[in-house]
Regions:
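N-terminal Rossmann NAD(P)H-binding glycine-rich loop of SDR-like oxidoreductase domains
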Residues: 4-26
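A conserved amphipathic terminal alpha-helix motif
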Residues: 435-472
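Beta-strand/loop substructures that line and gate deep hydrophobic ligand-binding cavities in soluble
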Residues: 401-439
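Substrate-positioning beta->alpha
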Residues: 95, 159-160, 179-201, 207-208
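Conserved beta-loop-beta element that borders a ligand/cofactor-binding pocket
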Residues: 136-157, 163, 170
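Hydrophobic ligand-binding cavity/cleft-lining segments
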Residues: 290-384
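Mid/C-terminal beta-alpha module of Rossmann-like enzyme folds, strongest
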Residues: 199-262, 273-325
Length: 472
């Protein structure tokens, strides 16, 4: 009898390890395949840990082939290349869309996604809006999605809990901005993992969304005080109601050592009460979870508590200078990626004049030249076999400004709501010295996409304008 196969995206994170352990304890133990963008020699309970770049649809298709279930635990809040242009929300969306597409192609039965609690508030932060957008992208291609929405997951190695611990450790007095008065219904790591295990392969959970959390919902300032008590480091509290979100991000990053890219979206999401609407899944599974105090004590007492959270670690410097650049631009009503790619090729020859000359042939291969140059600076070739109406792909196949790479590419894809187009360059390796690339070609690319976005909106401006006006 062939075992079920479960693929875990984000397997090497602290939640991923716990979920892997929970799934491995099933009586009919499934094959567990972990995906990672980093090292594959990490110890874990999975059967295989395979390298996979979630930004590559090809990689994801190969990774989920033969799987029956996919567990998605990925949040792209940290750099995935030497240079990254684009918001974490757009990066997250591309990864989720690739998983949704690949899962549908492979006949995957269910995707289980651990997202964030969504408050009843129209003014959601970019972080929480992104979580909801990821849910939509995972299910946009027909695979049943089970979403578990959680606030803070408390456990050893958890970046959010580690931020609280480091604030208590390092500050002589606790600075309490106004957002610390909001409530958070946190959940302990083991209960979160057990609930994911509970819904994987359970047909009644297909297509369902559940809020999960512990039995209490303390204020953030009370959570900080609780951690101080458990560490025997009681600190006097100083209320600072006028501390802006921007200043909060700066001082939290400075004090804790957490990357600013990680702190910023987390701080933004703390301006809401993060509480469950109900806990029906936990009632059904008989997994009420621990109080915050119990969860915090367990996390602090864990033998793993000295481990540095994965989100705090700097990614190893890549052997090549990889570039990832993503822009979100408005898409006219009723149009798709195929139309946008055709329009891009039609627009290029005149759209970059007088800065660049672009020749486009009948096969939609675009060659970029300096105004009077004879050798192309960049060559893009349309990938017919890898393109569809809602995703168009071009490979970078040559030019003086590009090093040879079989993975460098430009793509256009439509967002799940159909209102925007994501234009993305992935794994591009420039031939220019790094310092020169950053102050020249990297800036030109952003300006080109800004101008194309303006063209789609029916307006235009000069390529080398110094305007900083946002276009999307």
């Amino acid at each position: 009898m062939v075992r079920d196969s479960i693929v875990i995206a984000g397997a090497t994170g602290f939640v991923g390890h716990a979920v892997t352990r929970a799934l491995a304890q099933r009586p009919d133990r499934p094959e567990i395949v972990g995906l990672t963008r980093g090292r594959t020699d990490v110890a874990g309970a999975w059967d295989r840990l395979v390298p996979c770049d979630l930004f590559s649809l090809k990689d994801v298709e190969a990774a989920v082939a033969g799987a029956r279930h996919v567990v998605y635990l990925v949040h792209s809040m940290l750099p995935s290349a030497r240079l990254v242009q684009g918001s974490f929300a757009d990066l997250d969306l591309i990864c989720a869309d690739n998983v949704g597409r690949a899962a549908a192609c492979a006949g995957v039965e269910q995707i289980v996604y651990l997202g964030g609690l969504i408050p009843d508030d129209p003014g959601l932060s970019a972080h929480l809006t992104s979580r909801r957008e990821v849910e939509a992208a995972l299910g946009a291609h027909g695979v049943a999605v089970t979403t578990l929405r959680a606030g803070m997951v408390v456990g050893p190695g958890g970046s959010s809990f580690q931020i609280i611990k480091k604030l208590v450790d390092r500050l002589p007095a606790m600075v309490l901005p106004s957002w610390t008065a909001h409530r958070c219904q946190a959940i302990d790591l083991e209960t979160a993992a057990a609930l994911i295990d509970h819904v994987v392969g359970r047909p009644s959970a297909y297509g369902q969304t559940y809020d999960i959390g512990g039995p209490d919902a303390p204020r953030y300032r009370d959570m900080i005080a609780t951690v101080g008590e458990l560490l025997d480091r009681k600190r006097p509290a100083v209320g600072v109601p006028l501390l802006t979100p921007h200043l909060s991000r700066l001082w939290v990053s400075l004090i804790t050592g957490a990357p600013a890219a990680l702190v910023a979206p987390l701080i933004e999401s703390l301006h809401h009460d993060m509480v469950c609407r109900d806990r029906r899944l936990q009632d059904e599974a008989r997994l009420p979870g621990k109080t915050f105090r119990e969860a915090a004590r367990a996390a602090l007492e864990s033998a793993e508590r000295k481990a540095k959270p994965a989100a705090y670690r700097r990614a190893p410097r890549p052997r090549q200078v990889g570039v990832r650049s993503v822009q979100r631009i408005p898409l006219p009503s009723g149009r798709d990626a195929e139309w946008a790619a055709h329009e891009y090729m039609r627009w290029l020859p005149g759209g970059l004049w007088p800065g660049l000359r672009v020749d486009v042939d009948d096969s939609r291969t675009a060659s970029f030249f300096a105004l009077h140059g004879k050798r192309p600076l960049l060559v893009l070739r349309f990938a017919t076999e890898r393109s569809s109406s809602d995703r168009q792909l071009f490979y970078v196949v040559g030019g003086l400004l590009a090093k040879h790479s079989e993975r460098g590419r430009l793509e256009f894809r439509v967002t799940p709501d159909g209102h925007h187009l994501l234009t993305a360059i992935h794994e591009y390796v420039p031939a220019l010295p790094w310092w020169l690339y950053r102050i020249s070609q990297a800036l030109v690319h952003r300006l080109v996409m800004r101008r194309f976005g303006a063209h789609l909106r029916g307006s235009d401006f000069a390529l080398f304008s110094l305007s900083r006006r946002r276009t999307a």
